[in-house]
Design a protein with these regions (language model features):
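Extracytoplasmic/secretory-pathway segments with low complexity and glycosylation-like composition
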Residues: 17-220
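Secretory targeting and sorting signals
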Residues: 1-21
Length: 220
């Protein structure tokens, strides 16, 4: 998976005072988590306005403080914070920016967070058997592809879905476990992403799965 931008910083400019009703720009419908490190979680870009100029602000996610800072002279605040960690499935979360000087000045937004993952069922099967592929975290409005590599070379690319089936980038498909005639024994690498052409460093979210093909011998 590509490294998801996930730095935490509140930035404030300088301008003449001008206060309005507190509001926040809408959040994305879903964010992606691929690990507990901030760099493994998608960045949430926050923009809120209407606070007391230079007021002290606190940003929380699900009541947990993520960062603090001050509004600018316009009463505006921007922040870039990592999405919350999600190890399995998806869930909703609430992001809140509140002001210390005036507790009534509160801006909030809700969204969802999903883990990034791909599952093959059953896990053990003949390479030619049709199995179920499912995944989540592929949130681009684009097709979802699977690239099969062996020995460092792309052997086949298939399309699992024309587009994700939900805002959190889910898909399901039934395909041959390895769509190659008589695949060689050894470790095959399946990379699922949203790019038609394979790249070891894709520009979309990606998940890699190792499929081990073993050689069987018939008794005489």
């Amino acid at each position: 998976m590509r490294a998801l931008l996930a730095t935490v910083v509140l930035t404030f400019g300088v301008a003449a005072p001008a206060q309005a009703a507190v509001s926040m720009d809408p959040l994305k419908l879903c964010y992606v988590s691929d690990g507990d490190l901030p760099s493994q979680r998608e960045a949430i870009h926050v923009h809120a306005s209407g606070f007391t100029p230079t007021g002290h602000l606190t940003l929380t996610i699900d009541s947990q403080t993520v960062d603090t800072g001050r509004a600018d002279a316009f009463g505006m605040a921007t922040a870039v914070v990592p999405a919350p960690f999600q190890g399995f499935g998806e869930r909703p979360f609430t992001l809140v920016v509140s002001e210390a000087e005036n507790p009534q000045n509160v801006a909030s937004g809700t969204s969802r967070v999903t883990n990034l993952g791909v599952t093959l069922k059953p896990k053990r099967a003949r390479p030619s058997r049709r199995i179920r592929f499912s995944g989540r975290g592929f949130t681009n409005l684009a097709p979802i592809y699977g690239h099969y590599l062996f020995g460092g070379k792309v052997r086949r690319t298939v399309r699992f879905a024309n587009a994700p089936s939900s805002p959190c980038g889910t898909f399901r498909a039934r395909r041959k476990q390895i769509p190659v005639k008589r695949p060689a024994p050894g470790d095959w690498l399946l990379q699922v992403d949203q790019q038609r052409r394979y790249s070891p460093t894709p520009g979309s979210n990606a998940q890699r799965v190792v499929i081990r093909v073993t050689e069987t011998f018939k008794q005489p």
